[in-house]
Amino acid sequence: MSFLQNFHISPGQTIRSTRGFKWNTANAANNAGSVSPTKATPHNNTINGNNNNANTINNRADFTNNPVNGYNESDHGRMSPVLTTPKRHAPPPEQLQNVTDFNYTPSHQKPFLQPQAGTTVTTHQDIKQIVEMTLGSEGVLNQAVKLPRGEDENEWLAVHCVDFYNQINMLYGSITEFCSPQTCPRMIATNEYEYLWAFQKGQPPVSVSAPKYVECLMRWCQDQFDDESLFPSKVTGTFPEGFIQRVIQPILRRLFRVYAHIYCHHFNEILELNLQTVLNTSFRHFCLFAQEFELLRPADFGPLLELVMELRDR
C-alpha cells in the first residue's frame, strides 16, 4: 500500500495539451481581455475605405471578420452581420503569462515530492536530532504500554504484536517505490549489519534484497497470526506454552529489522513524504513496549542501539 499517489503541479508550471487544442494569449492584452483561438487573426474592418477608429469594429472570432456569401460592406450598400460580445476588463499582464490546460491527462505515476530545506540526513546524530524535535516529552506512550489491571499478559502481547505488524507494514509501504532490488540488493542496516532469510528449515539463511526480505517476513508473520494454535481468535482459546519466547520475541526481533532498514537507508524519503513524526512515534512505541516486557536484547537493536537508548530516557 503506497502513500500519496496524488498528482501536483508546481506553481507557475504550464502543461502541454494532448487533445489538439491550446488557448492563445499572445494578443489578449490588445483585445480587451478577450481570448481567441490560435487560428484567429483579428483585424479591423474599415468602412468606405476610411481608417477611422470610431468606425472600426474589433471582432471577437475569425468567422465574424470574413464576408458572408461573398458580400462585404461596400456590396449593394449592405453590411455583413457582425457578432459582438460584451467587453471585459483586461486582467493584469502578469496573470496572462501562463495558461493551464485543464484537458491535460497526466501520464506520469510518480508523486511530486517537495523536499524540505535542510533535511539531508547523513549521520545517526542527525536522525537523533530530528526524533527529538518530532517527539514530545510526555509520558503518554510510557503509560500506554503497561499491562492493564486484570488483563491477560499473553493477550496483551498478542494484540500489540499484530498492531506493530500493521504499523510497520504501512510505513514500509509508503517507501516501496524507493526500495527496490536495484536500490537495495541486500537487507542491510548500514554496512555493518545484514539480515539473512532462511526459506526452509534445516537450510542456512541466504542473502536477499530488502523488498524480498520484507515480503517473506510479512507473509511469515501473517501465517503465524492465522494459526489458531498460536494466536487463538476465540475467547475460549488458550495460548501455547512459551508463547512469549517462541512466538512474540522472534516476530518482534524481525520486525525491528524493517525499522532499522528504513532509518538507515530511507529516512530522506520519509522526510520528503513528511512521515517522520509517524515513524518516530511508532518506533518509540515499539521500543517502550519491548522494554516494558523485556522482549528484545541490546544486541537485537544493532545500529539503532544509541537511538533506542535515547528514546527510552525521554
Curated annotation (Swiss-Prot):
One of its GO terms (biological process) is exit from mitosis. Zn(2+) binds at residues 179, 184, 261, 266. Present with 5020 molecules/cell in log phase SD medium. This is DBF2 kinase activator protein MOB1. Keywords: Cell cycle, Cell division, Centromere, Chromosome, Cytoplasm, Cytoskeleton, Metal-binding, Nucleus, Phosphoprotein, Zinc. Belongs to the MOB1/phocein family. GO terms for cellular component: cellular bud neck; chromosome, centromeric region; cytoplasm; mitotic spindle pole body; nuclear periphery; nucleus; serine/threonine protein kinase complex; Sid2-Mob1 complex. Functions as an activator subunit for the DBF2 protein kinase. Binds to DBF2, which is required for the phosphorylation and activation of DBF2 by the upstream kinase CDC15 in late anaphase. DBF2-MOB1 is part of the mitotic exit network (MEN) signaling cascade, which regulates release from the nucleus and activity of phosphatase CDC14. Required for inactivation of mitotic cyclin-dependent kinase for exit from mitosis, cytokinesis and G1 gene transcription. Pfam families: Mob1_phocein. Residues 29-55 are annotated as: Disordered. Phosphorylated by CDC15. The modification Phosphoserine is found at residues 34, 36, 80, 229. It is found in: Cytoplasm; Nucleus; Cytoplasm, Cytoskeleton, Microtubule organizing center, Spindle pole body; Bud neck. InterPro entries: MOB_kinase_act_fam, MOB_kinase_act_sf. It comes from the Eukaryota. SUPFAM superfamilies: Mob1/phocein (SSF101152). Residues 44-55 have a biased composition (Low complexity). Interacts with protein kinase DBF2 to form the MEN DBF2-MOB1 kinase complex. One of its GO terms (molecular function) is protein kinase activator activity. Residues 29-43 have a biased composition (Polar residues).
